[in-house]
């Protein structure tokens, strides 16, 4: 069995070096690496060549900037593997990943699979805090690969794979936000098997800039409404929770201002719960302290994006703006 590792890249030379270093260190090397440079102004071709000379099977392609979905499709068209495996360029892969993946597929031959993401010990405390909030049940409901989840598992392209047979029938990714959720939905609709392999995590470097993190989760919230327009039955209660949290927080703040500070108690208890849970999970006071603002940004960004998109696309009836989505995704 040959795996084709497909990675879209945009101006991430240092991250690509770390990714290729981790792939070179794999215990099992039954894979090729297909790097697709999506119009970067700082290309990583020299890094790819360096690791190819070390013996890693790396194929490097440069194309005009059109967005990561088109870049992934470009890679799949040129890949030779039986399975396509997708990582983000800011991921680092544990040494036993492919050895474990082979075993998992032998025991449970899924058509499409995904794995969780985690924080490496070398990551900054901010990255670890964001990783915690992006994977915690308290802030996500477990929908990003947690063992306890409020909805069916949906693979994400930071750690996702599917067979060539899936690709032949379903086709490639659409150029849209949350394209991995859209892809997983189409795969499921075609009757293919989808599941979570908890044994194959990746180490995912999170954004260390709070503004960029806000923008990222804000777009996640907006894209959930786009998915609802495409798949009317896909919106679940768990997806609405950040928006409910934003509305509830604003209401409690107003009540605290005009009536009594006691209305802040529910907010305080929730943030304390996040701090305590993060402290137990990470064993670090610093990470636990940073997890509190990370959770506020995550829920606030997602919730406001969700509310904004719901109002404009559903209440005002404007629907999807495909051209805007494509333009926003270029160079991301």
Language model features: what each stretch is:
Residues 21-30:
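Short, acidic, metal-binding catalytic loop of nucleotide-sugar glycosyltransferases
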Residues 84:
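Short aromatic/hydrophobic "clamp" motif used to bind/position activated sugar donors
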